[in-house]
Regions:
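C-terminal motif of bacterial Sec signal peptides marking the signal peptidase cleavage site
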Residues: 14-17
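OB-fold/S1-family single-stranded nucleic acid-binding modules
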Residues: 90-108, 180-199
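Structural detector for short beta-strands of small beta-barrel domains
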Residues: 23-42, 113-132
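Bacterial signal peptide processing site
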Residues: 19-21
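Flexible glycine-rich surface loops and low-complexity tracts that mediate binding to linear polymers
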Residues: 74-85, 165-177
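Short, basic/aromatic beta-hairpin or loop at an interaction surface
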Residues: 46-57, 136-148
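Positively charged n-region of N-terminal signal peptides that target proteins for export
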Residues: 1-4
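N-terminal post-signal-peptidase region of extra-cytosolic proteins
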Residues: 57-67, 149-158
């Protein structure tokens, strides 16, 4: 009887120790060969796109995967650890992902939906706005209900702004590398919808 009680105690202790360390899960992910674009906390940002084995669509991972060196043009299969953070940083994910194993790396082009490369219509005011001594475009997005003019801090490829004219642009997005391992969102004019001289 005593031996049975001791065995029960040891088993309970072992299970308790396992539960105490059971603050993470192990998953297998497919990582797309291209980065997508998604809404971050303040603006659009490049994101990894991943699928679990039972997923049918890609989803965005904002914080990246610790220990994983992404190279565009390859589709990856990874085994990763997802750890729930007890006290996550403000404005950050409550889950931290880290690489356990690189299962495969295959050169290919993943089939990414166009929704991960958003296009939008932008209106540009005839006069720029000054902010800490620098001039910026003043823009708004009435098609999505953003009717107040706001400062625009990003370059728009293919747009030659001429002060004194108001513009309506169709703008597209893409991901470009700016340094080894670093990427940013590039904005480009898809179509000049309207250009009018400012009203007196």
């Amino acid at each position: 009887m005593r031996k049975y009680i001791i065995l029960l105690f040891i088993s309970a202790f072992a299970l308790g120790a396992c539960d105490k360390n059971d603050d993470y899960t192990v998953r297998e992910w497919t990582v797309a060969s291209q980065l997508g674009i998604s809404h971050g906390f303040h603006t659009l940002q490049p994101v990894l796109l991943v699928k679990a084995n039972d997923d049918t669509s890609w989803r965005a991972v904002y914080e990246g995967i610790e220990g994983f060196d992404y190279e565009p043009g390859y589709e990856y299969k990874l085994r990763i650890k997802a750890k729930q953070l007890a006290e996550p940083p403000q404005d950050a994910s409550s889950v931290r992902y880290s690489l356990l194993e690189l299962i495969s790396k295959i050169p290919t082009r993943s089939n990414i939906p166009d929704s991960y490369y958003p296009t939008f219509t932008m209106e540009v005011a005839p006069e720029p706005v000054s902010y800490y001594g620098e001039l910026y475009l003043s823009v708004r997005f009435p098609e999505v209900g953003l009717n107040d003019w706001q400062r625009w801090s990003f370059r728009i490829e293919g747009f030659d702004y001429e002060q004194g004219y108001s513009y309506k642009l169709k703008v597209g997005t893409s991901v470009v590398g700016v340094d080894e391992g670093y990427y940013t969102v590039q904005y480009s004019v898809l179509e000049m919808l309207d250009k009018q001289p400012a009203q007196e």
